[in-house]
Design a protein with these regions (language model features):
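A conserved structural/catalytic subdomain of Rossmann-like adenosyl-cofactor enzymes
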Residues: 81-84, 107, 170-174, 178-181, ...
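Short amphipathic alpha-helical segments and their helix-coil junctions
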Residues: 89-101, 207-227, 328-333
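Non-catalytic accessory regions of SAM-dependent methyltransferases
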Residues: 181-249
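Long recognition/docking surfaces used for binding and targeting
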Residues: 237, 241, 245-357
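Conserved S-adenosyl-L-methionine
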Residues: 364-480, 488-495, 502, 518-519, ...
Length: 691
């Protein structure tokens, strides 16, 4: 007899669970019923489980309220087979993405928890809800025909980057009953990612961001004619700010696609609507963003959104601006709404410029620092919660974002009072970071980046750091104005300068370090700056600062963006370099990452040889010396001296010992004898065969 296929018991499971919910007196909604306008719209926006557009329909959904009045969306998905509760990926997360960052519709459609987590991501992406309960229930009949069931309960939140965390094992859903729900939420709130889990989740999401940016830019490049690179940058930045929204007192609703009406009426064009939303957002943030800066941002966006009539002109009922806005929030919305502390706009900038026909010199100047290198520089500059960090060629503010994250993490670990931590966090963002960027479109990216990271944009200045900056705050805090002390008290300097500048960019280093009294500096620069192209600047720097380390970076560090060899130089500021001062020379050519340069690849950076441990070891070697050697050996690490009057001897490497040892002699003799014996045996074998 042919083998009978097992019949799904999904209808039985639906009856069972819906019966529970009814007995708990919960106001649940079935697949085709409406829960609320916000959730319905989000589910319609998202791709369906099969990959079509719209029509996400959880089998059951409800809003559960805790005793504080907070609503938690609960999304429930049913399946009818024994092995269809959940499928995890290689990192132990619920599998909803393929390896090339596409929605894994096969698993989303086949497994109950996977479908429920997929729906939860729609809510993170398109609503203000940040905490969602995803439930999967599957069942089967045992050999006696009795219905069995299994439940998976996951907490999906911006705190776990939308991947979800397993709450606990449950036999029913009585934890949703009003009298039990507070206890359940307490359990949910106690869930924390380990540092390793957090690191893996961030890394995975950052890979997804990179892939999404490739897709976004490819779409705009191919389908939206007439937009220059600057226009694209401004439109993307404007779309993100308009879509952010603000909760709490006097809330600002995020701009949605449906708010853009594609009207030709002056004052009601899509650009007018978007600009009003940006104005409302920035006005709400007025405590963090000075009025002068707000006006500059509004004027910049006004030029981008209103001057070009073509982007507001409806074609077939839709404006180009609405199309671009829709693409931005569809491709990127999830990532900036879950609050990733990454150099988001740095990734955006690098991807945008990846498609442009710049000369190599221009590319060398506009390339931005990878986030892991930015973090390396901030750690080498010994940044902590009390540091005052500045960057004289800030780009998209990626180095300042890295420094800010380290400062906030340090504050979080050392300040135990929530109120005091909140106060310190605001102080870090408002008064302890300063960046200067001369190019207007890149300056706007820096502003956007810091807004996304939490409003640390007050002292990002659109100035020439060499000719227009005297060391003062751009927007000084009130207490400094009262004391008439406007100087920014910098004690940490990070920099990736334009290499076409004088001395390959060492002119920036000379000025910045000359304005500091103490602290540390870490810069990444074309390595010829240390071997003759910046001799005079280097001599001057060493009159007031000590070179602590010279680190040779991988040749392919900026693959696809720039082809120059770079070094990182680390300084202690305020002490002149003496001829006997020890300098640590580190060959970091092998940093553990494998890089590729494929425009449409979802991942062009892979940790293939303990990269994270290598970066941590470099920081320790610079700080503590050769007793921290672990992965590296004395072939890559060398302690030597430089001549402070030379200025071109900063790129040394470990000397190669050419003097033969007795062991070398023995090995050579052994190799020779082995070769002779091999030949004798070969000849003897050939003779015996008559050859």
């Amino acid at each position: 007899m042919p083998k009978q296929s097992i019949q799904s018991v999904e209808p039985n499971i639906a009856d069972l669970v819906n019966g529970w919910l009814k007995s708990y007196n919960l106001n649940y909604k079935l697949e085709q019923e409406s829960l609320n306008d916000s959730i319905d719209k989000a589910l319609d926006e998202y791709k369906s489980k099969q990959g079509g557009t719209g029509g996400n329909r959880p089998d059951c959904k409800l809003l559960a309220k805790d005793s504080y009045g907070t609503d938690y969306p609960v999304l429930i998905e049913y399946k009818g087979y024994k092995d269809r509760l959940i499928k995890l990926d290689e990192n132990g997360n619920v599998a909803i993405k393929t390896s090339d960052n596409k929605n894994d519709y096969k698993k989303i459609n086949s497994y109950a928890v996977n479908g429920a987590v997929h729906y939860a991501n729609a809510l993170l992406h398109y609503t203000d809800y940040t905490d969602i309960i995803s439930i999967g229930v599957t069942g089967w009949k045992d050999e006696n025909g009795n219905l069995q069931h299994e439940i998976g309960v996951f907490y999906v939140s911006s705190k776990n980057f939308g991947y979800g965390q397993d709450v606990a094992k449950y036999d029913d859903l009585s934890f949703l009953k009003p009298e039990n729900f507070d206890t359940f939420i307490e359990k949910v709130k106690s869930l924390n990612l380990t540092e390793e889990e957090k690191s893996k989740s961030i890394e995975k999401r950052e890979q997804e961001i990179s892939a999404s940016l490739v897709k976004l830019n490819n779409d705009i490049y191919k389908n939206e004619s007439g937009l220059s690179e600057s226009a694209r940058i401004y439109l993307v930045a404007a779309s993100i700010i308009a879509n952010l929204g603000i909760k709490g007192e006097n809330p600002v609703k995020p701009l949605e696609k449906s708010d853009l009406k594609c009207s030709s009426e002056k004052g009601e064009r899509d650009g007018d609507i978007m600009l009003r939303k940006i104005n409302a957002f920035l006005s709400h943030k007025s405590k963090n963003i000075p009025e002068d800066k707000k006006n500059l941002i509004i004027q910049t966006f006004s030029d981008a959104l209103l001057t070009n009539e073509n982007i507001n002109k409806p074609t077939n009922g839709e404006s180009q601006l609405k199309r671009v806005f829709s693409k931005v929030i569809d491709d990127l919305g999830l990532y900036y709404k879950i609050g990733l502390t990454t150099d988001f706009t740095g990734k955006l900038f690098n991807e945008m410029y990846n498609w442009l026909g710049f000369t190599q010199d221009k590319l060398n100047d506009v390339v931005l620092t990878p986030s892991y290198v930015a973090t390396l520089l901030a750690r080498l500059a010994r940044v902590n919660k009390d540091s005052y960090v500045w960057d004289f060629a800030t780009g998209s503010a990626g180095l300042l974002v890295a420094a800010m994250n380290i400062m906030i993490d340090d504050a979080k670990s050392s300040i135990k009072s929530p109120d005091e931590f909140k106060k310190k966090e605001a102080e870090i963002k408002a008064t302890q970071l300063l960046g200067l960027e001369i190019l207007p479109q890149i300056y706007m990216l820096a502003i956007l980046n810091m807004i996304l990271m939490g409003d640390g944009s007050s002292n990002i200045l659109n100035k020439n750091s060499l000719s227009d900056f005297n060391g003062d705050y751009g927007f000084p805090p009130k207490e400094r104005i009262e004391k008439r002390d406007l100087k920014f008290p910098a004690d940490a300097f990070v920099l990736n300068p334009p290499y076409s500048a004088s001395g390959n960019g060492m002119i920036f280093v000379e000025k910045a370090l000359g304005m500091m009294n103490r602290g540390y500096a870490a810069i990444i620069i074309q390595n010829s700056a240390g071997s003759g192209k910046a001799t005079e600047y280097n001599r001057n720097i060493l009159k007031h600062s000590t070179l602590l380390a010279s680190i040779k970076m991988p040749i392919d560090l900026f693959v696809g963006k720039s082809s120059v060899q770079t070094n990182v130089y680390v300084f202690r500021v305020g002490e002149a370099h003496q001829k006997d001062d020890i300098v640590k020379f580190i060959d970091f050519s092998e940093d553990g990452y494998t890089r590729t340069n494929r425009k449409k690849a979802s991942v062009n950076l892979r940790d293939t040889n303990r990269a994270k441990e290598r970066y941590a070891e470099v920081v320790d070697l610079v700080r503590f010396g050769k007793n921290k050697l672990n992965i590296f050996t004395e072939k890559e690490y060398y302690e030597g001296t430089i001549d402070p009057e030379n200025g071109s001897d900063w790129n040394q490497s470990a000397p190669v010992d050419t003097k033969p040892t007795l062991q070398d002699f023995k090995k050579t003799v052994a190799d020779y004898l082995a070769w002779e014996v091999s030949n004798l045996l070969k000849n003897k074998a050939e003779d015996s065969l008559g050859k």
